[in-house]
From Swiss-Prot:
Organism from which the protein derives: Rattus norvegicus (Rat)
The keyword Ubl conjugation is assigned to this record: yes
Modified residues (N-acetylalanine): 2
Domain PUA: 297-372
Protein name: H/ACA ribonucleoprotein complex subunit DKC1
Family: Belongs to the pseudouridine synthase TruB family.
């Protein structure tokens, strides 16, 4: 049996190795001599495809470049790569608000679920209204004001009290209610019922059911528009009367119902998974970075060294600018970002794109709202020549700890240094430098004239209208008193005369 098994064994198949043809040494040498292995200089840099980059860095290669030189600082991080605690505290939720609870209740529940200190929303929805409610968390609440004033879109159902001709008539009536409209809040409203003007940008009829007299419509409008009032006006315009049956908000600002809208259950599940399984992926899908709300703004990219100064309220100056967008207009709202794509602040532009490209100094924008936390980036101000000299003098004891001059302060420092935080020194500096085209003699003459005018004013005190009125009243009162006294004396003499006449008659009688 064993012999049979031995006979049954099959021979092992050996894999054939692929034969490699060795390259002759001469050929390698020839290739090395023939080809130039170097990075060749080019007239233009290769194009980066940044169309798929996230949030505020999208298409950043299309921004105008003021300078490409800056010193990167290893602080901060890309908004999508923040540590989970920081990510939640600087994020927002595009929530599908359920029917029946009020907006404030929903926001309070979210705060309790995520265990954060502060939450806010993008505009109140009535209890029965559903749809897009942007819930901002902690740092993102700084953007609530701008989100509340952003445009909104709704889909509503209107019930008409009587039959109409058809969809065309409803469509014409809805088209009439476009543009600036007078509105008074409904009877049951949380605000004062004052007449107000609100703008309807666009509207259209989606569907009309003549049997049930129900019409579905879509409307894009200004923040604070009452769709309930719009439905009442629509009924009046059609001559049959109408009321709002149902309403859903489909867009709030730049975020719509198709942009990763989540429910309250999703938020609860995401927090549960993180608490019990340390799985933060679901939480990152529910919460989005606040930078997503600012993607419609024009961008200004700042150097890393200028970021913390802006967080402390410094002006946005041109030397700290790296890149800027096309089409910036004066008084337009812009967003200031870092090189990593983090939002630093929302600002009001003071220069147009054309002016920024031609100037080398000046204030580019003024801060409207700082978003980033202070000291996320290190302090980089106070490193200039004057500031360094001041620090040295404080160290040597020639200035006090606040930088104020002492007895041992060098005369050159007190003469040359201007402390712009001291208002008295500002005034003296302004007086010392008269305006262009005005000589010192002319300035002194003007000053002398002012002094003489003030002396004259002191010599002749002016009486105010109030004092004059009081004097007039006193005079009238005094005159009235004298007249009354005179009248009283006359009455007394008359009475005496009458008494004398009666006494004489009695004696004669």
């Amino acid at each position: 049996m064993a012999d049979a098994e031995a006979a049954m064994t099959f021979p092992k198949k050996h894999k054939k190795k692929k034969e490699r043809k060795p390259l002759p040494e001469a050929d390698v040498a020839e290739i090395q001599h023939a080809e130039d292995f170097l990075i060749k200089p080019e007239s233009k840099a290769a194009q980066l495809d940044t169309s798929q980059w996230p949030l505020l860095l999208k298409n950043f290669d299309r921004l105008n470049v003021r300078t490409t030189h800056y010193t990167p600082i290893p602080c901060g991080s890309n908004p999508l790569k923040r540590e989970i605690g920081e990510y939640v505290r600087t994020g927002f939720i595009n929530l599908d608000k359920p029917s029946n609870p009020s907006s404030h209740e929903v926001v309070a529940w979210i705060r309790r679920i995520l265990r954060v200190e502060k939450t806010g929303h993008s505009g109140t929805l009535d209890p029965k209204v559903t749809g897009c409610l942007i819930v901002c968390i902690e740092r993102a609440t700084r953007l609530v004001k701008s989100q509340q004033s952003a445009g909104k879109e709704y889909v509503g159902v209107v019930r008409l009290h009587n039959a109409i001709e058809g969809t065309a008539q409803l469509s014409r009536a809805l088209e009439t209610l476009t543009g600036a409209l007078f509105q008074r809040p409904p009877l049951i409203a949380a605000v004062k019922r004052q007449l107000r003007v609100r703008t309807i940008y666009e509207s259209r009829v989606v569907e009309y059911d003549p049997e049930r007299r129900l019409g579905v419509f879509w409307v894009s409008c200004e923040a604070g528009t009452y769709i309930r009032t719009l439905c009442v006006h629509l009924g009046l315009l059609l001559g049959v009367g109408g009321q709002m049956q149902e309403l859903r908000r489909v867009r709030s600002g730049v975020v719509g119902e198709r942009d990763h809208m989540v429910t309250m259950h999703d938020v609860l599940d995401a927090q549960y998974l993180y608490d019990h399984h340390r799985d933060e992926s679901y939480l990152r899908r529910v919460v989005f970075p606040l930078e997503k709300l600012l993607t419609s703004h024009k961008r200004l990219v700042m150097k890393d060294s200028a970021v913390n100064a802006i967080c402390y309220g410094a002006k946005i100056m041109l030397p700290g600018l790296l890149r800027y967008e096309d089409g910036i207009e004066v008084n337009q709202e812009v967003v200031v970002i870092t090189t990593k794509g983090e939002a630093v602040c929302v600002a009001i532009a003071l220069m147009t794109t054309a002016v920024i490209s031609t100037c080398d100094h000046g204030v580019v924008a003024k801060i409207k709202r700082v978003i980033m936390e202070r000291d996320t980036y290190p302090r980089k101000w106070g490193l200039g020549p004057k500031a360094s000299q001041k620090k040295q003098l404080i160290k040597q004891g020639l200035l006090d700890k606040h930088g104020r001059p002492t007895d041992g302060t060098p005369a050159s420092w007190t003469r040359d240094y201007v402390d712009y935080s001291d208002s008295s020194k500002k005034a003296t500096a302004a007086e010392a430098t008269p305006g262009p085209g005005v000589t010192a003699d002319a300035a002194s003459i003007v000053k002398r004239k002012r002094d003489s005018d003030s002396d004259a004013d002191e010599a002749t005190p002016t009486t105010t209208p109030r004092v004059k009125k009081e004097k007039k009243k006193k005079k009238e009162k005094a005159d009235g008193g004298e007249e009354a006294a005179e009248d009283g004396d006359g009455d007394a003499t008359r009475k005496k005369k009458k008494k004398k006449a009666r006494a004489a008659e009695e004696l004669s009688g």
